[in-house]
Amino acid sequence: MSTSSHACPVPAVRGHMTHYPAAPYPLLFPPVIRGLSLPPLHGLHGHPPPSGCSTPSPASVGQACQRTTGGSQFAASTKWTPSLNAAIETQSTSSEELVPSPPSPLPPPRVYKPCFVCQDKSSGYHYGVSACEGCKGFFRRSIQKNMIYTCHRDKNCVINKVTRNRCQYCRLQKCFEVGMSKESVRNDRNKKKKEPSKQECTESYEMTAELDDLTEKIRKAHQETFPSLCQLGKYTTNSSADHRVRLDLGLWDKFSELATKCIIKIVEFAKRLPGFTGLTIADQITLLKAACLDILILRICTRYTPEQDTMTFSDGLTLNRTQMHNAGFGPLTDLVFTFANQLLPLEMDDTETGLLSAICLICGDRQDLEEPTKVDKLQEPLLEALKIYIRKRRPSKPHMFPKILMKITDLRSISAKGAERVITLKMEIPGSMPPLIQEMLENSEGHEPLTPSSSGNIAEHSPSVSPSSVENSGVSQSPLLQ
């Protein structure tokens, strides 16, 4: 068969076999096979050859093979098939895929400076400075809740990883000193408000047998040392019920008698807490003196009646706001009633009140503890029990646990002012202060006892009291040790 006399353009052949010399169109592979019979081939893109071009005959292909390979004898014994074509292409492709690409290097881990506040390991930059998770959360809560803290020393406490929980006042001041920004907290809060609310937590919480037993023991200890409002026969008095006076001595005598009985009940409650009597005597005294006023205020506020704006004591005596002021609460009165109103929406039951009282008492950040780590270990199951109990009781309110726990901060703020009030009362009453009130309340969280002649500025009389000095000053007669 003769080919056309017109010249046919030969496209450049590109592909995997470029190391072979270029062959006339349409050969794509080395023309090493003589006498092969090919079906008509189309163009590179599946189209027939342009007009004027014809497909070469087997004879011309054979001649081209002769010229290109120099008459290779391999072509005489090999038949060209589509499967051979596919095999060659597959082999070429696979050879390229086997070449591994070098792995990209991992970015180096980001390293932050230690926490500017306590020197603990930093988790990143928070509110303008490098800070750990603990200091970040403490600063955020303090700003969002407008917390007011009190330092019981010289307002120059050392803040580090170990001591950061011992003085909230100095910790907050150091947060400001290192550059933490109030505005960053507010902006962060506003940003979160705009975000869509997340789905309610549906996680279930189950109480272990040990925690259930612990919860039951604390509930009984609370109920048997503090009768509920419905168990009391309420009675009132008309003494100074209409206007405030500096001090009603009749009400003060009654109140001091009831307060002494309440303190004895709190000591009994503490001794019934699992693990409390296993602490050193000095630590038991330190914890009781630090938390006694906290628990007193919490207990009296759970007996608040908002309709009459009254509070009821353990013998049933019911006083209104004015009478509470005149009985000795003085400037502390409105703070206590405000706190009582804040407790109402929480709807705490006896179990929650008992657990919260136990957490107030067994707290490892109190000053002058001999074994703070042991106290912290004792507090951990109390926190877990309270969390699980609250979430089981209120499954649709997952944020109730932190709300209730934050009340400890409010209690500490009020009781710090209460300790100062006990000191000033000594100068207002004609006789001596009942010894148990003076011992347990006046010295709470480091306040030294004062005499009228050494009153002066209260802030000047707040060094810490060590357990050894407490024992040497007659605390060995405390009901705790009886």
Swiss-Prot record:
Subcellular location: Nucleus; Cytoplasm
Composition skew (Low complexity), residue ranges: 462-482
Region: Modulating, residue numbers: 1-114
GO CC annotation, single: cytoplasm
Intrachain disulfide bonds: none
Pfam families named in the record: Hormone_recep, zf-C4
Zinc finger (NR C4-type): 115-135, 151-175
Region spans: Hinge: 181-209
MF (Gene Ontology): DNA-binding transcription factor activity; heterocyclic compound binding; nuclear receptor activity; nuclear retinoid X receptor binding; protein-containing complex binding; RNA polymerase II transcription regulatory region sequence-specific DNA binding; sequence-specific DNA binding; sequence-specific double-stranded DNA binding
GO biological process: apoptotic process; bone development; cell population proliferation; embryonic digestive tract development; embryonic eye morphogenesis; embryonic hindlimb morphogenesis; glandular epithelial cell development; growth plate cartilage development
UniProt similarity note: Belongs to the nuclear hormone receptor family. NR1 subfamily.
Protein name (Swiss-Prot/TrEMBL): Retinoic acid receptor beta
Source organism per UniProt: Mus musculus (Mouse)
